[in-house]
Amino acid sequence: MPERRTVALVTLGCARNEVDSEELAGRLAADGWDLVEDASDADVAVVNTCGFVEAAKKDSVDALLEANDLKDHGRTQAVVAVGCMAERYGKDLAEALPEADGVLGFDDYADISDRLQTILNGGIHASHTPRDRRKLLPISPAERQDTAVALPGHAQEAPAPAPEDLPEGVAPVSGPRAPLRRRLGTSPVASVKLASGCDRRCSFCAIPSFRGSFISRRPSDVLQETRWLAEQGVKEVMLVSENNTSYGKDLGDIRLLETLLPELADVDGIERIRVSYLQPAEMRPGLIDVLTSTPKVAPYFDLSFQHSAPGVLRAMRRFGDTDRFLELLDTIRSKAPQAGARSNFIVGFPGETEADLAELERFLTGARLDAIGVFGYSDEEGTEAVGYENKLDADTIAERLAHISQLAEELTSQRAEERVGETLQVLVESVESEEDGEVAIGRAAHQAPETDGQVVFTTREGLVPGLMVEAKAVGTEGVDLVAEHHELAEVAR
């Protein structure tokens, strides 16, 4: 009988990375590895890193060092870096961080089991030389579907294992660009990749250089994966990619998302479909209509504004201004008054003036966003903005970050207060123990996992994870809502 091999996956970063980890888990489980939750119980600890901004990279390095410490006591024998930071820096990361026994890029994912076994046996797998992955795909989007470039979340052209040959809980390969997958956890919410990469050239962003150009997954693969997730008990699916508004452009139909969403909403067992990562400049009336009027599709708009001062946006290689962005939000709310809206912003961008900051404040005050993320600008090697003049000093960036973050906290708390009295459809996600008993936690249509607020129920009576219930918002705790389960609210009347 083969010796038991155990592996733990530690995931940092965004929902796209979570999907990649579940792909790696599926590949490893299909090849006989036992997945464990705690890295201290694993022969190999695989850290799925994030390479987005400096703080995320630091967190990734810290996680690798923490995993390395486990080798001094307990079962752990090897630590391996995967993910965006590993792909972005390759052998440079391996040289800078000898504590990692291996640094694997996206091209290694299809052979992840063999790679880990080699490392576990004391062998060495040479790390890749970093390269610009945008150059691996044709310039024309229409020519990208037939390429054989490794794309996390998209299986390659390979013979599909028979379902009976796969361990329980592993999704079978459904064809080209639909990966093996094994769920890591029991949450009633799961992400599904619509696409990989990005064709935009924002001057501050390095993501396209290591995630590559934009390429869509085929609708049939997205549907099959969603059906499988429903069979696993998932109630809400969140569609993720670097830019969901571009979905279908390489498949000959830029409006493919408008067609796909109703089909996903019709999958048996799925209670909610949520779309994330939308570009304001690419929003179109038909997409807004589908997002605001399709049953089971959340009227939720994760819009990547980044700033609202025209001069700053131009320097970012982006489009828009305060008034056009406010008009977009007005259009959305005219169709769905309770629609959720969130965004992220960068402050302290090179050349940003006090007037630009005031313009951003004007937008934030008028936008009534449910959730706001604020980041201070930092240079990312390989981006256009690194060479910009008129850079702000670190103290000024820190001051502006603190100021806008405080404003964002106040505004999102006010927005939560505006929602008191609303009737909400809430997906119960967990029941947690507190000093005075158990409390049920969920999220309404305007609240995405991890990044946004949540709903705290006044009682957990009759509530279990995975249940979709109607509730009335009766109070707030910062950006979170306090709500009564609808049946209890009726009794109270």
Swiss-Prot record:
Q: Where in the cell is it found?
A: Cytoplasm
Residue runs in coiled coils? none
Per the record, the GO terms for biological process are: tRNA modification
CC cofactor: [4Fe-4S] cluster
> Which InterPro entries does this UniProt record tie to the protein?
Elp3/MiaA/NifB-like_rSAM, Methylthiotransferase, Methylthiotransferase_CS, Methylthiotransferase_N, Methylthiotransferase_N_sf, NA-bd_OB-fold, Ribosomal_uS12_MeSTrfase_RimO, rSAM
- Give the catalytic activity: L-aspartate(89)-[ribosomal protein uS12]-hydrogen + (sulfur carrier)-SH + AH2 + 2 S-adenosyl-L-methionine = 3-methylsulfanyl-L-aspartate(89)-[ribosomal protein uS12]-hydrogen + (sulfur carrier)-H + 5'-deoxyadenosine + L-methionine + A + S-adenosyl-L-homocysteine + 2 H(+)
The record describes how the cofactor is bound as: Binds 2 [4Fe-4S] clusters. One cluster is coordinated with 3 cysteines and an exchangeable S-adenosyl-L-methionine.
Enzyme class label: transferase
**Which molecular-function annotation in GO is an example for this chain?**
metal ion binding
Give the Radical SAM core domain ranges: 184-415
The family database entries (Pfam families) matched by this protein are listed as: Radical_SAM (PF04055), TRAM_2 (PF18693), UPF0004 (PF00919)
Q: Where does [4Fe-4S] cluster 2 bind?
A: C198, C202, C205
Q: Which PANTHER family match?
A: RIBOSOMAL PROTEIN S12 METHYLTHIOTRANSFERASE RIMO (PTHR43837), RIBOSOMAL PROTEIN US12 METHYLTHIOTRANSFERASE RIMO (PTHR43837:SF1)
For this chain, the family text in UniProt reads: Belongs to the methylthiotransferase family. RimO subfamily.
Q: What does this protein do?
A: Catalyzes the methylthiolation of an aspartic acid residue of ribosomal protein uS12.
Please identify the protein, giving its name as recorded.
Answer: Ribosomal protein uS12 methylthiotransferase RimO
Organism, scientific name: Streptomyces griseus subsp. griseus (strain JCM 4626 / CBS 651.72 / NBRC 13350 / KCC S-0626 / ISP 5235)
Q: Which gene encodes it?
A: rimO
